[in-house]
Amino acid sequence: LAQADRAGNLNVSRFGSRLAGAGGFINISQNAKKVVFAGTFVAGNLQVDVADEKLKIISDGDRPKFIDAVDQITFSGAVGAQSGRTILYVTERCVFRLSKKGLMLVEIAPGINLQKDILEKMKFTPLMAEKLLMMDARIFRPEAMGLKEDLLTLPIAERFTYQPEENLFFVNFEGLSIRSIEQIDEIREHVERICR
């Protein structure tokens, strides 16, 4: 994440007069079902610390990455927005989501001042989510985040899909382990509700 602009365009290939090239970046970012760009919010001498589940900026970078227009478009925000995919821009202090109208600020790190640490460090004003969320507090703790459960577990309610126009009922039991009568009852309730 070298540069991003209000439209969600991203430059990861050109740094001043130096052309680094995009490698497989374009193929991956254009074909992934969900795209998460990650990098620091600013460049140059950034020093941060995490204490008491909050992010503290010790020394802020002196080169903004969120600018009016990127020097070179390696990822097109307009094309990405039209694709309907989830596209996120994650930094140490905030998270943006690409919308059809451009970059939208959706999350902020605990300990960060919206005006001083984010908006004043950008060369444009981003769209703002109706409700600005706090980034997951687990990020700012020293222990492991416990992502296995989040990433690999599909809740029972999300394992059933009914398509009424074709009268098709899909059930996804991939990776499911039944360990209790309560789980069986929950499955029965969902199936009965959908099939009524």
Predicted regions mapped to residue ranges:
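Conserved phosphate- and dinucleotide-binding cores of soluble alpha/beta proteins
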Residues: 1-143
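Long, compositionally biased
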Residues: 146-153
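STAS-typified acidic loop motif
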Residues: 156-192
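A structural preference for short, pocket-lining loop segments at secondary-structure junctions
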Residues: 194-196
